[in-house]
Amino acid sequence: MRSLACERDERLLFSDLSANFEAGDIVQILGSNGAGKTTLMRIVAGLSDSYTGEVLWNNAPHRGYDFFASVLYFGHATGVKQTLTALENLRWYFGLNGNKNTSAQAIDVSEAQLEAALHKVGLAGYEDVPCHQMSAGQKRRVALARLYCSKAPIWLLDEPFTAIDVGGVQQLESLIRAHAESGGIVLLTSHQPVSVPNLKTVDINQYRPLRGQKSDMAVGNDY
C-alpha cells in the first residue's frame, strides 16, 4: 500500500497510509469505530475504488486475475446462500472460485476435506441442513469453514472471530498461524485481542485527518 487516502461522504477517513506486507506476515488493522478499518480491507481486496494512492501485488496494480485468484476475502456479509446446505455452500464456493495454492495454481478440494472443514468449525451433523434454518452464528461458521480448505496466499479477514466461542477462536488463531508459517499473508480486523506470535499492526488512527477536515479528492466509484 502506497500513500493511500480515502474519503466517505466528503470526509477524509485517512491519508498518506503506506505499508508493506511480506510472506509470513500476520497484520491486524487497528482503529477506532468509524476510522475506516473495513473500508481499508475492501480497498486491499479490490472491492472499492473510493481512494487515491496505490495497492500493489508483486509490483503490479492489484486488479488483475493473478491477484484476485490469490485472495480469500472474509467480510461482514458471509456470502452464504440461504437455499443451499452447509456442504453445498462449500461445494458452490470452491466450484465458483476454485482453490489456489501459494503459487496461484489450481488444486482440487475433496468432499472429505469439505466435510472435515465443517467438523472443525463445530458443524458436524449440519452438513445437509439448509442454511436458512441456521442461526447467524452457524452461517458465519459455514463461511469460516472455507479457510480450512483454502490455499489462497492472501487472507483478508474482517472480524473473523465474531460469533464463535473461545475454543473456536483458539482453533482459528492456530489456522492463521499455520497459514503464515506456510508463506501466506493474513490481514485482519478484530475487536478482541489476537493471540498470535509476531503480530504486526497498522493503526489507521495515525493516518486520520484533523477533526472536521473535508476532502477534495477525485476518486472512482465502488463497484
Curated annotation (Swiss-Prot):
Which GO cellular component does the record give, naming just one?
Answer: plasma membrane
EC number from the UniProt entry: 7.6.2.5
Q: Which GO terms describe its biological process?
A: cytochrome complex assembly
What is known about its subunit structure?
Answer: The complex is composed of two ATP-binding proteins (CcmA) and two transmembrane proteins (CcmB).
This chain is encoded by the gene named ccmA
Q: Where in the cell is it found?
A: Cell inner membrane
GO terms of molecular function = ABC-type heme transporter activity; ATP binding; ATP hydrolysis activity
Q: What is this protein called?
A: Cytochrome c biogenesis ATP-binding export protein CcmA
What positions does the entry give for ATP binding? G31, S32, N33, G34, A35, G36, K37, T38
Grouped into one coarse class, the protein's main location is membrane
> One Pfam family name from the record?
ABC_tran
Which species?
Answer: Saccharophagus degradans (strain 2-40 / ATCC 43961 / DSM 17024)
Question: Domain named ABC transporter: which ranges?
Answer: 1-223
- According to its UniProt entry, what is the function of this protein? Part of the ABC transporter complex CcmAB involved in the biogenesis of c-type cytochromes; once thought to export heme, this seems not to be the case, but its exact role is uncertain. Responsible for energy coupling to the transport system.
The entry's family comment says:
Belongs to the ABC transporter superfamily. CcmA exporter (TC 3.A.1.107) family.
Which transformation does this protein catalyse, written as a reaction?
heme b(in) + ATP + H2O = heme b(out) + ADP + phosphate + H(+)
Keyword set for this entry?
ATP-binding, Cell inner membrane, Cell membrane, Cytochrome c-type biogenesis, Membrane, Nucleotide-binding, Translocase, Transport
Q: Which InterPro entries match?
A: AAA+_ATPase (IPR003593), ABC_transporter-like_ATP-bd (IPR003439), ABC_transporter-like_CS (IPR017871), ABC_transptr_haem_export_CcmA (IPR005895), P-loop_NTPase (IPR027417)
Classify the protein's membrane topology as the record does. Answer: Peripheral membrane protein
